[in-house]
Regions:
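Phosphate-binding/switch region of NTP-binding enzymes
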Residues: 165-241
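P-loop NTPase motor core
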Residues: 124-197
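Conserved P-loop
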Residues: 25-121
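Residue-level signature of catalytic and energy-coupling elements of molecular machines
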Residues: 72, 128, 203
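C-terminal regions of RecA-like/P-loop NTPase motor modules
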Residues: 2-30, 36-42, 213-256
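P-loop NTPase motor domains
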Residues: 104-123, 132-137, 230-249
Length: 256
C-alpha cells in the first residue's frame, strides 16, 4: 500500500481549481485574540400573555434615573399602547416612528443603533413587540399567496438573524417583548412564545410574566446571574428593568 507524501497530496482547493479553471485564492492570515472578560450589551426577551404589564415595565424603566434614554419601536397591534404610560411620573420613553413595513421598521432600528448615545446613563432600545414584527416579515414574504417552501423560509429566517445582528450593535441593552400562547407557565412557556422559533435561544436573558406585573427570570446567559439562575426560575415580582440591567453589568458592557 502506498500513501501520498505531504508534498504530493491533492488538496480540496486544488480539486476546485482544476474543475473551475480558477487558481485557488491565497490563504488568508488568521488571527486570534484573548477573551476580554467583558459582557456584551444584553438582548432581553420579555415574554408573557396579553395585558400583563410588558409595555408598562418598559415605560417605567424610562423614568429610572439610571436610564438616560429609552427608545421604543411599537409594531402592529402593539402600536399606541405606550402613549397611555406617558402619565407615569418621570416617564421619558420616546416612540420611534415608522410606516409599518419591514423595510422601514428595520431602517428605523438601524438608525437608532447608529445614533450617538445620550450621555448620563443607560441607553435602552425596546421592540414592542417581536411577535408582531415576525408576523410582518412572514406576511410580506408570503405576499400574493406565495408558497415559500423550505428554501424560502430559510431565507426568511436568515433575514431575521441579520436583524438580530443589527440589534447587537446598539450601544446599550435591547428588550424585545413577545406574546406567549395560553397560560404563562414558566416550565414550558418557551416553546409557546409567538415569534421566530429561535428567539429565546438567541437572546441573553429570558424574563417570563407569570401574572399581572409579576415576572420571573426564566434563564440568563450571564456570569453575574449564573449562580442565581442555576437553581431554577427566579421570582422578580414587579419588574424593574434598570435593576436587571445593573445585575447584568450593562453599565459596563462594551466598555473599552
Amino acid at each position: 500500500m502506498t500513501t501520498d507524501s505531504p508534498t504530493s497530496r491533492t488538496s480540496l482547493l486544488d480539486v476546485v481549481a482544476a474543475r473551475t479553471g480558477k487558481a485557488p485564492a491565497a490563504p488568508r492570515e488568521r488571527r486570534t485574540r484573548p477573551l476580554t472578560g467583558t459582557a456584551q450589551h444584553p438582548l432581553v426577551l420579555l415574554a408573557g400573555g396579553p395585558k400583563v404589564g410588558k409595555s408598562y415595565a418598559l415605560a417605567a424603566a424610562s423614568a429610572d434615573r439610571r436610564v438616560a434614554r429609552l427608545a421604543v419601536v411599537e409594531v402592529g397591534g402593539d402600536q399606541g399602547a405606550m402613549d397611555a404610560y406617558g402619565a407615569i411620573p418621570g416617564a421619558r420613553a420616546e416612540l420611534v416612528e415608522h410606516d409599518g413595513t419591514w423595510a422601514d421598521i428595520t431602517a428605523a432600528i438601524q438608525a437608532e443603533c447608529a445614533a450617538e448615545p445620550t450621555p448620563g446613563g443607560l441607553n435602552v432600545l425596546a421592540i414592542d413587540g417581536a411577535t408582531s414584527l415576525w408576523a410582518v416579515l412572514s406576511r410580506e414574504a408570503q405576499r400574493g399567496g406565495r408558497d415559500l417552501g423550505p428554501g424560502g423560509w430559510a431565507a426568511v429566517n436568515s433575514t431575521w438573524a441579520d436583524f438580530l445582528t443589527v440589534l447587537r450593535t446598539f450601544p446599550g441593552p435591547v428588550v424585545l417583548t413577545a406574546r406567549v400562547d395560553g397560560e404563562t407557565i414558566v416550565d414550558d412557556a418557551l416553546g409557546r412564545i409567538r415569534t421566530q422559533r429561535d428567539l429565546a435561544f438567541e437572546t441573553d436573558v429570558v424574563v417570563q410574566a407569570t401574572g399581572h406585573r409579576r415576572f420571573t427570570l426564566a434563564g440568563a446567559r450571564s456570569l453575574a446571574l449564573s449562580d442565581v439562575a442555576e437553581s431554577g426560575p427566579v421570582e422578580l415580582g414587579d419588574l424593574v428593568l434598570a435593576d436587571l440591567f445593573e445585575l447584568l453589568g450593562a453599565d459596563e458592557a462594551g466598555a473599552e
